[in-house]
């Protein structure tokens, strides 16, 4: 069985470690970030964020040609949305801002084809995955032919690589 190609949107504290681990496991991974400096840095085999052990994983993934970074999404079989979910400014009760999640979904929607999987991996509220599916459907994606899933983000800064390697993860 052919290994799937993976496109990870968002190369920050979740996306880049995930991309490097998948690439070092033998998957062809394209990483996407709107920050051109981050993309250039990653493609040199360097990192633009501070996280213990991440530099070695990224360097190995880039040297093996299994990880490449771009500023726009590339065709894949699996799309992982790993962008921030900040809170809206103001208000008495903090409300999550899904603008980055929905923009990332819109960016991959034209590439999603039958049999593909789209995974939201972000600290986001109940109903976020449904909103991702709605954006895909609005873009013309037939939801009966693709898989849409959620994977909670559960790592501690400074221990991300260890936790990604050792913690069990659920995708559903």
Predicted feature locations:
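Redox-cofactor binding/interface segments in oxidoreductases and associated redox assembly factors
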Residues: 79-81, 120, 172
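Gly/Ala-rich phosphate-binding loop of Rossmann-like dinucleotide-binding domains
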Residues: 19, 23-24
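N-terminal Rossmann-fold NAD(P) dinucleotide-binding loop
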Residues: 15-16
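Short beta-strand and adjoining strand-loop segment in the mid-core
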Residues: 123-125, 135, 161-172
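Conserved N-terminal Rossmann-fold NAD(P) cofactor-binding segment
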Residues: 2-3, 28, 34-78, 82-95, ...
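Glycine-rich Rossmann-fold phosphate-binding loop(s) that bind the pyrophosphate
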Residues: 11-12
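Rossmann-like NAD(P)(H) cofactor-binding subdomain of soluble oxidoreductases
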Residues: 87-154
